[in-house]
């Protein structure tokens, strides 16, 4: 029971961190797009106007993205034995997404921006998220596609309680929007982009919020069971001590 409570605590805390991270990255990205308010032209034009503040969303992502693995692991541990196959699928997809996203964020944070700060522009255009045709932008899109696809498998993993049913509905909608997300990777279209924005910036944080509530409820139930078992042991030991006196 104690192990289960610890798992739910980790899952609950990890969901909260993911929510804060995803919302922070989204807000900062939107703010930077409004501040810059210009389309990508070339690396020389970008170099004249670039600011180190632009890398903040990627710094946050680089630090916090691995937390999704804690959430996936907590989901796996909370499942019944016959449902744990889907938990493994979620962990696999989360691991793939984490590796890809960490690579994309690392390229800009640890390679591109230090080069720009040193006055080197050659070769950096493919390592900047500001360039819509860069390698890191493609990796980021692929990473979030895999991440949202992986968490859409919670539809198969969870049970039939009211909270779990709501989570499953969010998961299946997110899975459907992933088709638009996938098309957005290959085709630059406003409708497809809307699907990716809804999936990553709205439904994924919402799913994390509901999963956090799910872990919180599990944690409360588990603590009540622990307390009940402890009370039963106290009564049992008291009874044994009482009869031992005779």
Predicted features and spans:
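Hydrophobic, aromatic-enriched alpha-helical segments typical of multi-pass transmembrane helices
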Residues: 1-237, 241-245
């Amino acid at each position: 029971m104690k192990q289960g409570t610890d798992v739910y605590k980790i899952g609950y805390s990890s969901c909260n961190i993911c929510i804060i991270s995803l919302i922070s990255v989204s807000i900062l990205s939107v703010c930077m797009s409004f501040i810059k308010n210009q389309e990508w032209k070339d690396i020389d034009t970008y170099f004249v106007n670039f600011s180190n503040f632009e890398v903040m969303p990627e710094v946050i992502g680089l630090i916090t993205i691995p937390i999704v693995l804690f959430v996936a692991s907590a989901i796996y541990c909370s499942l019944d034995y016959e449902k744990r196959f889907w938990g493994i699928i979620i962990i696999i997809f989360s691991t793939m997404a984490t590796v890809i996203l960490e690579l994309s964020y690392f390229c800009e944070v640890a390679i591109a921006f230090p080069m720009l700060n040193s006055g080197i522009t050659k070769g950096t255009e493919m390592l900047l998220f500001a360039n819509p045709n860069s390698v890191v932008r493609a990796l980021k899109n692929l990473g979030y596609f895999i991440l949202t696809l992986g968490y859409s498998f919670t539809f198969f993993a969870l049970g039939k309680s009211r909270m779990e049913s709501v989570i499953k509905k969010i998961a299946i909608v997110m899975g459907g929007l992933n088709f638009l997300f996938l098309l957005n990777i290959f085709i630059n279209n406003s409708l497809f982009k809307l699907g990716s924005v809804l999936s990553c910036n709205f439904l994924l944080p919402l799913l994390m919020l509901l999963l956090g509530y799910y872990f919180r409820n599990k944690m409360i139930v588990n603590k009540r069971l622990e307390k009940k078992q402890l009370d039963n042991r106290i009564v049992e030991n008291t009874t044994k001590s009482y009869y031992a006196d005779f």
